[in-house]
Design a protein with these regions (language model features):
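Short hydrophobic alpha-helical segments enriched in small aliphatic residues
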Residues: 8-11, 22
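Short, charged, solvent-exposed linker or helix-capping segments at domain edges/interfaces
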Residues: 115-120
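Non-catalytic interaction-recognition regions
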Residues: 23-114, 125-591
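AMP-binding/adenylate-forming
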Residues: 18-19
Length: 591
């Protein structure tokens, strides 16, 4: 059973009774020993940070002698030799060597490292997790879909990255509240009403649903563009009038808005279910429209915002290094994104007591969020505000050039992408009779792992062949490694491990497992889920190397050795499942 980080956020109330343990890793343990030796030798209190060198140099390395050289005014290699002698005397290390100008390399016995791993797994906190965020609340804003539009590939990245960020926050002790802040208000709704009356009818809407609404929007925007070319604005003015009618609560206008929103929500829920993503709340812009205008009026009254002669309202941000003021209300009194976002900030601070808010939105909005966050500081909001931005979804075109992903019709719809992924997953299946559920897991794993295969800021390169490559950096490659382990564990009963087994054959696997808590911490601290993907791929490669040299459960393996190796595999299986769950990827039963 997986730890409760995958339950709804309110389930964490029970776990908050746990003490706020620091993450205890083998690296910390050996770093503390080096730190104590330095203190004993020189009376200096210094953090002896350890890193993982290439395996040929040892298990851990430290530059503490180089850092002490200036303070002690002595050659770093002499200091390193003195530290080495003390560490040798401790009997803790198999080997201590010095490299270069004074780097100290430490080699630990595999059996000692396995003991470290066993103790870490027995801790009260699930392995890989910590309590850095204990007692604090974070609100994650994703995927923030627009209603009356089909779910596009563009919103897929927000959903995937946001879900992983939410899981990372839970894994590091935060109470995480997720909100799909629906774009269910604003000028597009006026456009849909006018467009529906111009280009569609109830029969078409009932038959095609969200896709009819998408076409209506495109046709109406084109009609507005053609009118503007003639110097006319009739359709645009009608759309604005319908928006104001919705705002005033006009029954006919509200009926249109409710109808379009319900069609949209049904579609959004269906697609998010296929994507394996959900949120705790769906607080739409429309529900906060009144609060938004009230906030603007309050800010004008308090002198934080100022009203221009044309009636528009701005917040000046020069004191925060931003020359362009934030426009928070149009001259005709119509709201903007900023109007609603300020209301949302006020709502979340009041209702959720949020200490942090993470907005998972594409890089195109970087300047806007810089403005919004500066305005929030000026207003006096206390929450830490983070724009977790990501690059676009790209593809390689027929000329071999990387470009923004699109179809002949323009926007690539996520449902079509998921359908194609499942078709390819079935075609690439290695076994007969794989269930539809497993096909879906493989397809989704391929897409999501690609999303996390590089730093979110670099963009996502979409390539079908790479996505389903069973020998490369892909979701199916990692899933297959996990399936293989699960099958070995399923086919072999656990026994009593040989107490004298030295774990030399498993040492690199153990070291990789010991890295996991620090990888989770770094991924959470920097909001970089790709660190989890990189780690789990490296673990899969390490396991494949291990299988090549070490039989796990063949008949010629002694029972005690077999039990010891199966015990290690159970820990590997746990880490695979835990890490993939953070990314929102499920392990198939068969592939």
């Amino acid at each position: 059973m997986l730890p409760t980080l995958f339950h709804k956020w309110h389930a964490l109330e029970l776990r908050e009774l746990l003490p706020n343990y620091a993450t205890i890793t083998a690296m910390n343990k050996y770093a503390d020993q080096v730190k104590q030796v330095v203190k004993d030798l020189y009376g200096v209190d210094i953090n002896a940070e350890l890193t993982r060198p290439e395996a040929k140099f040892g298990d851990y390395a430290t530059n503490v002698a180089l850092r002490l050289a200036g303070q002690l005014k002595r050659p770093p290699r002499d200091i390193a030799n003195e530290i080495k002698q003390k560490l040798d005397q401790s009997g803790q290390f198999d080997e201590v060597t010095i490299a270069g100008p004074g780097f100290i390399n430490l080699t630990v016995s595999a059996k000692e490292l396995d003991g470290d791993l066993e103790r870490a797994f027995q801790a009260k906190i699930p392995y890989g997790e910590n309590r850095d965020g204990r007692g604090r609340v974070v609100v994650l804003d994703f995927p923030s879909t627009n209603t009356a539009k089909p779910f596009s590939v563009g919103h897929m990245r927000s959903a995937n990255q946001g879900w992983a960020a939410r899981n990372l926050m839970l894994a590091t002790g935060w109470k995480a509240i997720s909100d799909n802040h629906l774009g269910d208000y604003g000028s597009p709704f006026g456009i849909w009403v006018v467009g529906f009356r111009m280009f569609s009818d109830e029969e078409k809407l009932a038959k095609r649903g969200i896709y009819e609404l998408g076409d209506i929007y495109i046709k109406t925007k084109q009609a507005i563009k053609e009118e503007q070319a003639k110097g006319e604005h009739r359709i645009e003015e009608q759309a604005q009038d319908w928006l104001l009618r919705i705002e005033r609560g006009d029954p006919e206008a509200v009926a249109y808005s409710d109808k379009f929103n319900q069609i949209s929500l049904d579609h959004i829920h269906a697609v998010m279910k296929r994507l394996g993503v959900s949120t705790d709340y769906e607080i739409g812009e429309r529900s906060l429209a009144k609060l938004g205008k009230e906030e603007v009026a309050r800010l004008v009254k308090e002198g934080v915002a100022e009203q221009n002669k044309d009636g528009s309202v701005i917040i000046r941000l020069d004191d925060y290094g931003i020359e362009t003021p934030l426009l928070v209300l149009k001259s005709n009194g119509a709201p903007l994104y900023a109007t609603n976002d300020l209301a949302t900030l006020a709502f979340r601070e009041r209702e959720f007591k949020a200490d942090r808010a993470i907005y998972v939105v594409a890089s195109e909005q970087k300047f806007y969020f810089a403005q919004l966050f500066a305005a929030a500081k000026k207003i006096g909001y206390d929450a830490e505000l983070i724009h977790m931005w990501y690059g676009l979804v790209d593809q390689i075109n027929e000329d071999g050039v990387r470009e923004k992903m699109s179809s002949r019709k323009g926007v690539v719809l996520l449902e079509e992408l998921l359908d194609e992924a499942e078709k390819r997953a079935r075609a690439n299946a290695k076994s007969e009779g794989i269930s539809d559920e497993d096909i879906h897991r493989i397809a989704l794993g391929a897409i999501k792992f690609t999303d996390f295969s590089a730093d979110r800021r670099t963009g996502m390169l979409f390539n079908w062949d790479r996505m389903f490559n069973l020998t490369g950096y892909s979701g199916p490659y990692v899933q297959y490694a996990a399936v293989r382990i699960n099958k070995i564990l399923h086919d072999n009963k656990a026994g009593k491990p040989d107490p004298d087994y030295d774990y030399r054959a498993e040492k690199q696997v153990i070291l990789k497992l010991l890295d996991y808590p620090s990888v989770v911490k770094q991924a959470a601290d920097y909001l970089e889920p790709h660190r989890i993907a990189t780690y789990i791929y490296e673990l899969a490669k390490e396991m494949n190397r291990y299988y090549e040299t070490t039989p796990v459960a063949t008949k010629d393996v002694p029972a005690g050795v077999k039990a010891a190796r199966l015990g290690l595999l159970r820990r590997v299986a746990y880490v695979f499942e835990h890490a993939l769950k953070i990314l929102g990827i499920d392990i198939p039963e068969r592939m």
